[in-house]
Amino acid sequence: MIFKRQIQSEIQKKMDSGKIILLIGPRQVGKTTLIKTLLSESDYLFLDGDETTVQAILETANTEVLRNLTSNYDCVFIDEAQRIKEIALKLKIMHDQLNIQKLIVSGSSAFELNSLMQEPLTGRKWTFHLHPITWLEFEQEVGYLKSEQVLEQVLITGLYPEILKNPYPLFTNLLKHSKKKGC
């Protein structure tokens, strides 16, 4: 089940603006899924900042290396970008010196707090914040009746996409934990 996110149309409108799209949010709220959905009909380069090889390449890359890496793509998506040292400078180079039509970056909330990210990208980015699924998004996907039927469960688990898809491991874990604590 993939939820249509309210922010999706806002991001879509800015995709051809020539600015970097920066999507920030906590872990497991669906940042990667949302961007991949938006890019589903595009040919794009996906760089996963969790991969040490990607980190090593981007951290040491000069302009020529970045050009060679991205030259066959009009769109580049860097996921988990907060894991890449000096990423703001690399993004500035990609934006200013390379002809990348769409540059999309996602990362955790701590990513934006990094003051090094702000200065180099001033005026070069649109920042969007993705939160767990809203009640409206949930209700639109599953319908009013179903949403009311699972309200109590949702109040316990929250509206994180993975938990909504498969809540039973969480409940099993909570039950096991409560038995250990004597609750």
What are these regions (language model features)?
Residues 31:
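Conserved lysine of the Walker
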Residues 45-75:
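Short glycine-rich substrate-engagement loop in P-loop NTPases that contacts/grips substrate
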Residues 34, 38:
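Hydrophobic positions on the alpha1 helix immediately C-terminal to the Walker A/P-loop
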Residues 23:
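Hydrophobic anchor at the beta1->P-loop junction of P-loop NTPases
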Residues 111-126, 142:
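Short regulatory helix/loop adjacent to the ATP-binding pocket of P-loop NTPases
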Residues 131-183:
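Interdomain hinge/linker elements that couple catalytic modules in large macromolecular machines
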Residues 88-111, 118-120:
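Conserved catalytic/switch belt of AAA+ P-loop NTPases
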Residues 1-16:
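N-terminal pre-Walker A segment at the start of P-loop NTPase domains
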